[in-house]
Amino acid sequence: MENKKVIVGISGGVDSSVSALLLKQQGYDVTGVFMKNWEEDDTDEFCSAEQDIADAQAVCDSIGIPFKKINFAAEYWDNVFEHFLIKYKAGRTPNPDILCNKEIKFKAFLSYVHLLGGDYIATGHYAQTRLAADGSVQLVKGLDDNKDQTYFLYTLGQEQLRQTIFPIGNIEKSKVREIAKENNLVTFDKKDSTGICFIGERKFKEFLSKYLPAQKGEIHDENGIKIGMHDGLMYYTIGQRQGLGIGGVKDRPEVPWFAAKKDLENNVLIAVQGHDHPLLFKQSLQAIELSWVAGMAPADKFRCAAKVRYRQKDQSCEVEVNQDGSVNVTFDQPQRAITPGQSVVFYIDDVCLGGGVII
């Protein structure tokens, strides 16, 4: 470890704070860097970037490591946000956190780490790396199953993983808070952020409407009968119940309505009644833009487990790789609310193989 230089991304949260502390305790030469990836365009209550910077600075001062700030707002806009808007406009529901890890934290930030003369990059993700028998680096689930974040990291390749340390990957979240408290870090009881990567806790619909004009349209039931109006297809995600604005439809039972499908051609949202309506379930999917941690798929056809959303339990499936690199995934059990634009991520036991974007 002696003199190995690690640059840790400090977000102002408890996970990255403890990551920096542990690295320092392990004898690394540690520098904390706060990435500013979004230019605030308002002063509303949800813009907490200033507080995050102050907390990040306080943590670094407390640990006794240098603190730096870097602005990646232009890179974030070009490589994450614009892509995000294009997908939303097309009626997809993209996952910006995955793209942010790929384009910002493990690309733009990694380049900056090299400029600083860093040997390693470190983040507060709940994930682990492991050396496989063939010398490749595996991306492994975090010890805390409830917090495992490999779903968001599946685009990382060998070169990135060889230069990455996840200091809290083998620790439970409760223990992380305990360590922060014992060491008097100001972030010990700070709540976890749930907003979109770097856009914070703002009201999403309001936020999106600033950038994309919404096209209102009709909501139909599965038989094509109009039952309401929607505010714009981009605001809805498959399986969504809240915010459909359908209530008390004449001659229909008082059962909740769910968004089941988007008819993009006709700008119609199709809704069905009941959480377990058959139209909400599918047994297969196709995915594109595949990324394999090892550099290639394990085989042309293989069995594994998959998640179609963060925190979903692993689902057994068969994966078939097509000539064009896309995959067909067939699940043993039908899956609820498979959402185009979201990612499907593959696992064998606790090893993340990679993933792709659902179409």
Curated annotation (Swiss-Prot):
The active site is at residues 100, 197. InterPro entries: MnmA-like, MnmA-like_C, MnmA-like_central, MnmA-like_central_sf, Rossmann-like_a/b/a_fold. Its main location: cytoplasm. GO terms for molecular function: ATP binding; tRNA binding; tRNA-uridine 2-sulfurtransferase activity. The keyword Disulfide bond applies. The keyword Ion transport does not apply. It comes from the Bacteria. Pfam families: tRNA_Me_trans, tRNA_Me_trans_C, tRNA_Me_trans_M. It is found in: Cytoplasm. CDD domains: MnmA_TRMU-like. Residues 95-97 are annotated as: Interaction with target base in tRNA. Keywords: ATP-binding, Cytoplasm, Disulfide bond, Nucleotide-binding, RNA-binding, Transferase, tRNA processing, tRNA-binding. One of its GO terms (biological process) is tRNA wobble position uridine thiolation. Disulfide bonds join 100-197. It catalyses: S-sulfanyl-L-cysteinyl-[protein] + uridine(34) in tRNA + AH2 + ATP = 2-thiouridine(34) in tRNA + L-cysteinyl-[protein] + A + AMP + diphosphate + H(+). GO terms for cellular component: cytoplasm. The record marks 125, 342 as: Interaction with tRNA. ATP binds at residues 9-16, 35, 124. Catalyzes the 2-thiolation of uridine at the wobble position (U34) of tRNA, leading to the formation of s(2)U34. Belongs to the MnmA/TRMU family. PANTHER family: MITOCHONDRIAL TRNA-SPECIFIC 2-THIOURIDYLASE 1, TRNA 5-METHYLAMINOMETHYL-2-THIOURIDYLATE -METHYLTRANSFERASE. This is tRNA-specific 2-thiouridylase MnmA. It comes from Francisella tularensis subsp. tularensis (strain WY96-3418).
